[in-house]
Amino acid sequence: MKEYIPGEIEPKWQKVWAESKVFETPQRSDKKKFYNLVMFPYPSGTLHVGHVKNYVIGDIVARYKRMKGYNVLHPFGYDAFGLPAENAAIKNKIHPEVWTFKNIDIIRNQIKKIGISYDWSREVITCTEEYYKWTQWIFLKLYENGLAYKKKAAVNWCPSCQTVLANEQVVDGKCERCGTEVTMKHLEQWYFKITDYAEKLLNDIDKLRGWPENVKIMQKNWIGKSTGAEIDFPVDRLDMKIKVFTTRPDTIWGVTFMAIAPESPLVEMLVTDERKDELSQFLKKVSLEDRFKRTSLEAEKEGFFLGRYAINPVTGEKIPIYVANYILYEYGTGAIMAVPAHDQRDFDFAKKYGISIRVVIDNPEESIDVEKMEKAYEEEGIMVNSGPFNGMRSTLALEKIIEYLEEKGIGKRSVQYKLRDWLISRQRYWGAPIPIVYCEKCGIVPVPEKDLPVKLPKDVEFLPTGQSPLSLDEQFLNTTCPKCGGPAKREADTMDTFVDSSWYYLRYINPKLEDKPFDTEDINYWMPVDQYIGGVEHAVLHLLYSRFITKVLYDLGYLKFEEPFENLFTQGMIYKDGWKMSKSKGNVVSPDEMIEKYGADTLRTYILFMAPPEKDAEWSDAGIEGVNRFLKRLWNNIYSILPRIKDVKVEKIELKNKQEKDLRRKLHQSIKKITEDIEGGFKFNTAIAGLMELNNNLSEYLNSAKDLNLPLLRELVEKLTLILSPFAPHMAEEIWHDLGNDTLVVNEEWPAYDENALKVDEVTVIIQINGKVRGKIQTKVDVSEGEIKKLAFENAKIASYVDGREIVKVIYVKNKLLNIVVK
């Protein structure tokens, strides 16, 4: 009998697939299209099995959809710019480009060994000039339409990575890439005006019916829409006003101080001369605090009086202005009207600094005594000390108060978002240059489209210094102004790598097109992506940015769709020894080692069998060995009969006995179940369990049948091979070939199940007496109540429970249960 040797079978079929170009997708087809995409990786190192899970899930979907008759686009590429590759290159003392392409070669070979059915002719690498030319083109389109701009602002700075970070790249006050505490710096930076799309991005979340609910909630929370009022507080003895945003304008009569974020430019404008020295000491102290922890409810409130007062616009009272550590510059206007009676953080601050507390919303059940208050009253209630609104319910008064503020010219209705504009400047080398030049005569000038790409120079000192490495390269920096022809300097910052990944799914459509980023007709045939697969950690970064860029290109007339990803699946992680896999923990499982030991088909099948694919799972060496044993048993079962069924034609299958009927029914039940498992939410683990069960049914039949039904076995092995093929494609191709077929499994149709085969001739009916099981009766299907009662009473054991007792009621559930109620 032929032995199962994955090390021989798998390279053989990978070579056949490559030479026959079977996975190369025609640009157009009469078939229905299916664009299947997995998130591409950073090529900063080799892959471990946690990465592989993503690609294997995508491959099952692609192979299944091809067999279901779709024109499937299944491409792959590399998010090749950015900090991961640059940091690795610095650590290994090698140029980022050399390091990146070396890793790309390794990853490409790893993926080919796993048997992933990518169309390699569409491979995209974001650090190539052919790609980033069009990243720069997108920048220019945003700039031309007022959606890219430069401003000086307080920004997140990572001292380790020596670059700025977008808000989304700061997690709990730390750099999401290296874990270093983030500080603040005032720098001139480039931004994309994503806030112009906040409402659209928010409203369209509800259209994403194929997205997980948790991802949609995360995006809604990140956009963070708040409705309320903007109110102007005049500054005493200065010709200026402080604008605040509040969701609680009903509390304005209770404002007893103002608080400003330490990072706000207002601080320097408002502080009196005699307090400047003390202020700088306070700001220095606050700058050392974790910016996100300091704003939490539990954090110690710290403040500094600026020596100035504002005027409460409704009471006319002078109120002190403080700089306070619990105010975030990024939210609202970076200044707040503080209402200590009705906001806990304001209450804590007022108590600490002896600021007056005034109740303006009373508890309707028990009047509040300000002297006895131990915490803020933050609920709704009855308005008091609130001028014309006294006695009104606070919730009902909100609208009227906003109207009152507008009438008096004090404030206006406003909607604010937590979302901030997307900071895209990076003071690092390994990124797409920003296509802007600075001319003393003309100012900021965009590079003309015909001059793209602005090439990233190769010979640059890229070690991080806090200064953009390109600013030290005179040859790159010095240029001529496209407008006047005079001397000019190039922008030295590079773009955030999230700009590269915000549109890569569009480039796969025409990766080699030279005169435009994509062909409009092709893009509108293929897009949106039908199935997107990747990690949930990208919920408010890549996924939000991609939605934004798609909407911009739609508004500019380049696309006919507003959302890039129709369906999204977020896979769980693979853990080892209870931890996420990482080199530092020494718990990385290499796919190469697993393939060497067990074969790619075993690795693929085990990764999907471990747990439902959306769940986290713990790697088990015993688990992969178990799956390897299953595939060997399946192989041995098939090859034990293959010589006898190779030339058998399946025209008509005669089933001679119950055993044969049962086996054929099990086959078609398996086809039905596995089809439903793949279609209905990626239940790959239960689909594989179904394959294991069918193999057990085959084993039982081969071990017990006196005379093998060869046409039945030919049908079973053929169809079993087809439904096995997405999971273990190399084994499936080998079996298919050895069955005498001259086609490839990947080009075959997914088998349909036979409804007639699913029908059963006999059923087991459970007999209950007063609800307790007293026996089982094997009978033909759809037997009547009278017949089943007769059979039950003929059974001596069952009859003994009924004899001499009155039958009160009989309940019959056809083909399942007979319950006789007696007394």
From Swiss-Prot:
Coiled-coil zones: none
InterPro entries: aa-tRNA-synth_I_CS, aa-tRNA-synth_Ia, Leu-tRNA-ligase, Leu_tRNA-synth_edit, M/V/L/I-tRNA-synth_anticd-bd, Methionyl/Leucyl_tRNA_Synth, Rossmann-like_a/b/a_fold, tRNAsynth_Ia_anticodon-bd
Motif extent ('KMSKS' region): 580-584
Any Gene Ontology biological process: leucyl-tRNA aminoacylation
Binding residue positions for ATP: K583
Keyword Zinc: no
Enzyme class: ligase
Classification via Gene3D superfamilies: 3.10.20.590, HUPs (3.40.50.620), Isoleucyl-tRNA Synthetase, Domain 1 (1.10.730.10)
Keyword line: Aminoacyl-tRNA synthetase, ATP-binding, Cytoplasm, Ligase, Nucleotide-binding, Protein biosynthesis
Motif ('HIGH' region): 41-51
EC number: 6.1.1.4
Domain of life: Bacteria
GO molecular function, one term: ATP binding
Family listed: Belongs to the class-I aminoacyl-tRNA synthetase family.
The protein's name in its UniProt record: Leucine--tRNA ligase
Lineage: Bacteria, Thermotogati, Thermotogota, Thermotogae, Thermotogales
